[in-house]
């Protein structure tokens, strides 16, 4: 069995690549492209985000668990893969056709938007070959790391070569869409070396629809939350607000993604432990994984919260500074979302409670729909308010998860909540540091050397504060990672 630590490191490496390159390309694109054209792109991307989940129909999350359970049985592995792949092909074809003919429902006859819309359709077609769930279930994280590095470099070079003036939005869309297609094709041909297609009867597809529908809703909960917010913002007709919301979300998601990805690698192992009846190993991995997760994600989120305006200024220049508060709010939301992910994915999902996840997600999504509708009805178009409705709805979802887990006694949540509180208290010192630094060394919100010095001082003092509190409380996770770092340093020196 492959090392969970090596898997986590490889997956974190993938996430690091997915941080560095989007920051480089995003910063470049935000400065080069016309703000109106980029608003068109983000509006179309919002609509595409609605169709993408239907193309794979929950196969990613369901397949991750299904493949994990049969990966030791070659015959069953081929059968599960074949049935899910065939289903995905059918769903992708149907979804692509609906997408193409749905253009008039969302946009007027704008030639630029129409070109962007059609070119983005390539990303829908590419979902036929979207089989990353197999690689993750088989824990092929080293392959995923190298493939991601290749695709990211290819994308970066292509953007710098072909996107050169403010109206190259269609060219940019084509680069992004073709990169997605190439990415999936590489994974497809890699997996096909070891897994074969087998014949599957039509009757064998019927039992898949209910769990896949549950996974469709569970895995794409953002459609009822942040996606719904963006959809309402698109309906307001103020494209710049869509860009503010999208860029702020992208900054936080990309940076926080390096940590959220690391926790995801344990889902196949958790499913494996439960499948083998190893309850104690399962509980230990959940507790340990959640603690490591919070160890990193909470200080990262609080840090992004206090530096939200500066982050979007550096990322998108002065023309997107209006999204600063949104960036801070998204950072706070990351903590809520982290707990939702731990309780939903690692506890409810791995224990087979997809229906309960679906029900609770729908309840919370309906709450968000009601709140967003009230804002829209009363002509309140400020994007920050729409994000706050999502945060309230996701907090409600978290409460439902906690109540159900305690009722069914699936796992004692005391350990998870204890360290969530501890790391939150440690990270709260960042807020005091922020105000003290800005009182002593105030700067204007323009990109210059004083701004970067101010940010560096805040980040350095915050890191020292966090580490100091970890040392003071003799935090075992901190000393474990410190030991790994010292050991690695010695090996490098030798």
What does each model-found stretch correspond to?
Residues 1-21, 75, 202-218, 283, ...:
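N-terminal membrane topogenesis motif
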Residues 3-61, 96, 156, 210-239, ...:
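Signature of the first transmembrane helix
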Residues 4, 145, 169-173, 185-226, ...:
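Interhelical loop/hinge segments that connect adjacent transmembrane helices in multipass membrane
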Residues 25-50, 169, 207-215, 233-253, ...:
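Interfacial/gating helices of multi-pass transporter permease domains
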Residues 26-27, 56-72, 248, 252-290, ...:
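Helix-loop junctions and terminal segments of transmembrane helices
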Residues 30-37, 105, 113-114, 138-143, ...:
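Membrane-interface helix-loop junctions in multi-pass transport and translocation proteins
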Residues 124-146, 332-363:
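Membrane-interface junctions at transmembrane-helix termini in multi-pass inner-membrane proteins
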Residues 412, 417, 435-494:
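Membrane-proximal transmembrane or re-entrant/amphipathic helices at the cytosolic face
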